[in-house]
Amino acid sequence: QWQVHCLDVAALPLEQTSDKDKQLIIIAGVGGELLVELVRAILAQHPLRHLEFILCPVHHNYYVRQSLSALGLGLKSEHLLEENQRFYEILHVSTIAAPNCLPITATGSLMWQTLDEASLPRAHSYLSQVIGHYQRMPAHKQTPEIIHAYQQQLAQLLSEYE
């Protein structure tokens, strides 16, 4: 049985369900900073619950991934989606990290490992776009470690398909 709620996610009435029930919360279409705030609020309200999230931030994926990792969440799956010439990272994460989850990495892991050769141009385009985005930032806002991390991811991806 499932229910849809349209309300402040921190106010989700999870206490009305059994502690044994698994809860899947979907948050999509919001910026990365807000998405992290929402996940933090849910975890603070329900610290002992087994929760799973499907998350699709529209910006700040690097920040989102670092924050989710810092919150102790584990990665169940991740996918790169392209729609209307925009890219989206979709993350399925869980509060129960082991044994079926992986650590959440800052630039992605599973979504690159499951690529086939036909998907390589899309992945290359996405990573190039992300690198370009960070390189265009004003010098005082640039974060060389983020640029370097995505450049390494792109180089690794390209080397695997040579």
Where are these regions (language model features)?
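S-adenosyl-L-methionine
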Residues: Q1-K22
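Class I S-adenosyl-L-methionine
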Residues: L12-L14, L24-I27, E33-E162
